[in-house]
From Swiss-Prot:
Residues 167-219 form the HAMP domain. PROSITE patterns: HAMP. This is Methanol utilization control sensor protein MoxY. The gene is moxY. InterPro entries: HAMP_dom, HATPase_C_sf, LapD_MoxY_N, Sensor_HK_TwoCompSys, Sig_transdc_His_kin_sub3_dim/P. It is an enzyme of class 2 (transferase). Residues 390-409 are annotated as: Disordered. It is a multi-pass membrane protein. It is found in: Cell inner membrane. Its main location: membrane. Keywords: Cell inner membrane, Cell membrane, Kinase, Membrane, Methanol utilization, Phosphoprotein, Transferase, Transmembrane, Transmembrane helix, Two-component regulatory system. The keyword Transmembrane helix applies.
Length: 446
């Protein structure tokens, strides 16, 4: 916009300067031509000094006649150079209608000639003939008083047109840019608005074609991700079942055998102390292996999954955290409307792992002393289950942007996208750290 104003103003000034130079040249040529004719007439018609005629009277009449012409002036001067008469038609001449600055700008160099008036042997005076551009400058000013406003109005119109075009183009570019910004945020269903201008229509068509291609690629990736999650969960369930069915009985048998051995050795009159220590160590290790196996099985697939409600599943998780981290207070709040509903086994498993990962992050990285897990619905969207984890830990630092997500958060994001859910990474508000998972119900794989 500033460039358009500068260019328009420069063009107006250049055109004005050209018009002024040409007008000044025309005034000079017009007045010099009139001066030459007047001077030639004076030289030819002034009576000779020895002809016996009234030279001064005829010179005065000639001066009055020439002074009445346009673009020239004539006056009679005494031998000392002082005027002997006023201008013959001075009372009929109005003051210059052009402003003083314009007259000074347009007035050419003074052109004049002095013709002696003689009556032999005396010099009676001088007849002064000079170019007078006053009338011509007034005419030029009359033209300029129309041309210059029109010129500057045309310049203003050009600036207004440039501003209008710039605003129009900027708005259309901003609409395309806004659509691209939403696409960059992941909303690939947004499309750039169509336009009647061919150039912008082609630009919008190209952006929309790219968005459609990316949307198709994302849908394919989501489908593959959903299949991968389903296959992964099936494999985890199979491994958990194998561990439970094969390793569990063997560990139980091992502990039973150790207990039987301890009972048999208890009746010996003189049993070695090393034997008691060895049997106790075997019993202790067998117990730890059994606990580790139970933990691994629960990590692969929660034991209550499919047999208890989502609220009971989260309650079992919170109880486990209370047992292993007594210094942290973990609280569970469940909305009664959600307590008996089930979004599906895969969704429940995703909610369970989201809650577990978020609570662990609050304990390990945030050093939280109070963690609250809430399960409710959104007021404006009752079809969504909202799982929110809030803690009083340090959380992510404000003003540093979103931190690089870990593997746990990446897994949550992948599951949420595959299940059509919405995951909100941790953020700070009122000195608390919040994170959410919004799961539709019933939930289906995309």
């Amino acid at each position: 916009m500033g460039l358009a104003c500068a260019v328009s103003l420069s063009l107006c000034l250049i055109v004005s300067a050209i018009l002024i130079v040409n007008a000044r040249q025309a005034v000079q040529e017009e007045t010099e031509s009139a001066f030459r004719l007047a001077h030639e007439a004076v030289v030819r018609r002034l009576p000779p000094s020895h002809g016996g005629r009234d030279t001064m009277t005829e010179a005065i009449g000639l001066a009055e006649e020439i002074d009445g012409l346009r673009h020239v002036s004539a006056r009679i001067l005494d031998p000392e150079g002082q005027p002997l008469q006023h201008r013959a038609h001075g009372q009929l001449r109005s003051e210059a209608s052009a402003p003083q600055w314009f007259s000074a700008l347009m007035t050419p160099p003074l052109v004049e000639a002095l013709v002696p008036i003689t009556h032999y042997p005396n010099v009676l005076g001088m007849l002064r003939v000079a170019a007078d551009p006053t009338d011509e400058i007034a005419e030029v000013w009359g033209d300029f008083s129309i041309i210059l406003p029109v010129l500057f109005l045309a310049g203003l119109a050009m600036v207004g047109l440039a501003f209008l075009m710039t605003t129009l183009l900027t708005r259309r570019l901003q609409s395309v840019q806004a659509a691209m910004a939403q696409m960059q945020d992941g909303r690939l269903s947004v499309r750039a608005p169509d336009d009647r201008l061919t150039e912008f229509a082609d630009l919008a068509a190209g952006v929309n074609a790219l968005a459609s291609h990316l949307q198709a690629e994302q849908a394919e990736n989501d489908l593959l991700q959903a299949r991968l999650i389903g296959s992964s969960e099936a494999e985890r369930s199979r491994i958990a079942l194998d561990l439970h069915d094969e390793m569990g009985p063997q560990l139980f048998a091992l502990r039973a055998a150790v207990s039987h051995a301890q009972a048999m050795t208890a009746d010996l009159p003189e049993r070695p102390a090393a034997l008691d220590e060895t049997l106790d160590a075997i019993a202790g290790h067998a117990l730890e292996v059994q606990r580790s196996a139970r933990t691994a099985i629960n990590d692969l697939r929660p034991m209550l999954l499919g047999e208890a409600s989502l609220a009971e599943l989260l309650a079992e998780l919170v109880t486990g955290f209370r047992d292993v981290a007594s210094e942290t207070r973990v609280v569970l709040d469940v909305d009664p409307e959600v307590e008996g509903s089930s979004p599906g086994e895969l969704a429940e498993l995703s909610i369970y792992r989201f809650a577990r990962e978020s609570v662990l992050n609050a304990m390990r990285h945030g050093r939280a002393t109070v963690v609250r897990v809430s399960l409710d619905t959104m007021p404006d969207e009752p079809g969504q289950i909202v799982v929110r984890v809030t803690d009083n830990g340090k959380g992510p630092q404000s003003g540093t942007g979103r931190p690089t997500p870990g593997f746990g958060q990446i897994g949550i994001e992948d599951r949420a996208r595959a299940l059509g859910a919405t995951y909100l990474p941790p953020w700070r508000d009122n000195r608390l750290t919040h994170t959410e998972l919004r799961m539709p119900r019933p939930c289906k794989l995309r």
